[in-house]
Amino acid sequence: MAALGSPARTLRGLLRELRYLNAATGRPYRDTAAYRYLVKAFRAHRVTSEKLCRAQHELHFQAATYLCLLRSIRQHVALHQEFHGKGERSVEESAGLVGLQLPHQPGGKGWEP
């Protein structure tokens, strides 16, 4: 993972992923225990004194790691739904998935002029 960015950006990203997760249920994401926990934890570690600095960095690192996990899972599911096989594909369908076209022969295989 590269640079962490700001804690506010990480919190916004986590809340965005919560919205994606709760879109299927129809419940507002603000009614979930995860939302309440995240907001409470980030508010508790908002203080910038030197004594709480290490705990704030640890919370931010764990939150950024969890955000990466949630995004990766969502993207994996989207890719899986798009490319998951529905049985055996024909050669034409497989070529179309990667943007290729097969050459066309006028009389089929073994055609001679």
Curated annotation (Swiss-Prot):
It holds the Pfam family Complex1_LYR_2. Keywords: Mitochondrion. GO terms for cellular component: mitochondrion. Residues 94-113 are annotated as: Disordered. Its main location: mitochondrion. InterPro entries: FMC1_homologue. It is found in: Mitochondrion. GO terms for biological process: apoptotic mitochondrial changes; dopaminergic neuron differentiation; mitochondrial proton-transporting ATP synthase complex assembly; mitochondrion organization; motor behavior; negative regulation of lipid catabolic process; regulation of type B pancreatic cell proliferation; response to toxic substance. Belongs to the FMC1 family. Plays a role in the assembly/stability of the mitochondrial membrane ATP synthase (F(1)F(0) ATP synthase or Complex V). Interacts with ATPAF2. PANTHER family: PROTEIN FMC1 HOMOLOG. This is Protein FMC1 homolog. It comes from Rattus norvegicus (Rat). The gene is Fmc1.
